[in-house]
């Protein structure tokens, strides 16, 4: 799912999108939905069944985004009770005092956006999600040593109470390009897939 589906990236000249806010767009080919498409395709290549919800949960109201995405999550869990993992893809926003957006990239060439796992701890069972996050983080650090930023624990729920195996995944920041985010999604998918498949 994408609670903040309209979050987007810095686009190169000639590839601009129609903004719906600061570093936001309803254009699914340029926002988090596109990153989710990439992640879903890569996970599917490992034989993992994926339900990718392409809804713009923040389209009508940014403040209601988590409530809207929770309704989608609960609907999918009822429809597909075999769902084991729920990933909520976002992008970060890191800027200096002047508002200049930072670009979070790996040391590898070509560069990929860095990824961070955000864990909500204001609900029962958060430790199960954290165990998954640690396992995924360790796998990815062994595969792509500069891909992952530190895991962040915050006193929120982020809908992670809805299902065990829930992760909030931030793919890059507003200063990154979409191409860097797509590379990161592929790298993350590889590590996530190999973690849950026990490889």
List each model region and its residues.
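Active-site microenvironments of hydrolase-like enzyme catalytic domains
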Residues: 3, 73-119
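Active-site-adjacent mobile loop/cap segments within catalytic or ligand-binding domains
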Residues: 149-199
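Solvent-exposed loop/turn segments at secondary-structure junctions
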Residues: 5-8, 56-60, 91-96, 122-125, ...
């Amino acid at each position: 799912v994408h609670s903040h589906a309209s979050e987007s990236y810095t686009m190169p000249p000639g590839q601009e999108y129609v903004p719906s806010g600061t570093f936001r767009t309803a254009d699914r080919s340029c926002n988090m939905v596109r990153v989710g498409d990439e992640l879903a395709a890569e996970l599917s290549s490992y034989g993992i069944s994926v339900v990718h919800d392409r809804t713009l949960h923040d389209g009508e109201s940014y403040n209601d985004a988590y409530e809207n995405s929770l309704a989608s999550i609960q609907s999918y869990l009822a429809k597909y009770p075999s769902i084991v993992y729920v990933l909520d893809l976002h992008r970060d926003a890191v800027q200096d005092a002047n508002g200049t957006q930072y670009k979070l990239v790996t040391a590898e060439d070509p560069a990929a956006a860095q990824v961070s796992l955000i864990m909500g701890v204001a609900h029962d069972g958060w430790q199960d999600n954290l165990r998954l996050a640690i396992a995924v983080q360790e796998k990815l650090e062994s595969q792509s040593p500069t891909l992952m930023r530190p895991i962040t624990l915050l006193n929120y729920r982020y809908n992670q109470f809805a299902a065990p195996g829930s992760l909030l995944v931030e793919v890059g920041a507003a200063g990154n390009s979409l191409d860097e985010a797509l590379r990161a999604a592929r790298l993350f998918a590889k590590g996530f897939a190999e973690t849950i498949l026990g490889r």
